Amino acid sequence: MTAGHRRAKHINHNLIEACALNGWAMGVGSQRRELTDPKAAFEWQHLRRDFPEVSLYSNLGIAQLITNPLSDIQRLTDALQANALIIHCNPLQECMQPEGTTHYKGCWQALADVVKNLPLPIIIKETGCGFSRETMMRLNEIGIAAIDVGGLGGTHWGRIEGHRATHDPIRQQAAITFQNWGIDTATSVRHAAELKPSFEIWGSGGVLNGLNAA
């Protein structure tokens, strides 16, 4: 997915059309803006209207899950007629963003509450740094439906924020320092499988060739 620019609607239409042809699901971009501006939902509503048969997943950051009531989360998923909710965990990116939200206290309770009370599968996703064994063990105890490990080696949002910080040399240097920080996708997938969890294991990004896969 993509969002926030003039070609986003066209690109997302092509992506969901590919999903419809191949029987794939599609996760939308972060719905954070919709929490304060319901009109922002227009960016995604045409996808559901034009492709009602595709499984569409809502998407929100864990910081917003902590600071917003469940009723607001439900409003986002209802507006999309979502089939699942992705909670993305991106602490490195948030630390690098000038506008980032770095409040994570209460995240475990917020996750447990949404799993218990929202009538949709909950998917937890990293954004380029992978998950540790300990984190995945705890997520398994909470009862999430799937983990997308989103490990090191693919798109790395910490690096992207460093490139955005053209007038902030401290953030640029921090992005360089952390550019290889994280657990690679293949290792995260292997660690998850060793837990024999109840959740599905998804691996996105960082598997670039047959050697990585092996």
Per-region residue spans from a language model:
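Catalytic cores of alpha/beta
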Residues: 67-76, 129-149, 188-197, 201-203, ...
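Residue-identity detector for glycine
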Residues: 4, 23, 27-29, 61, ...
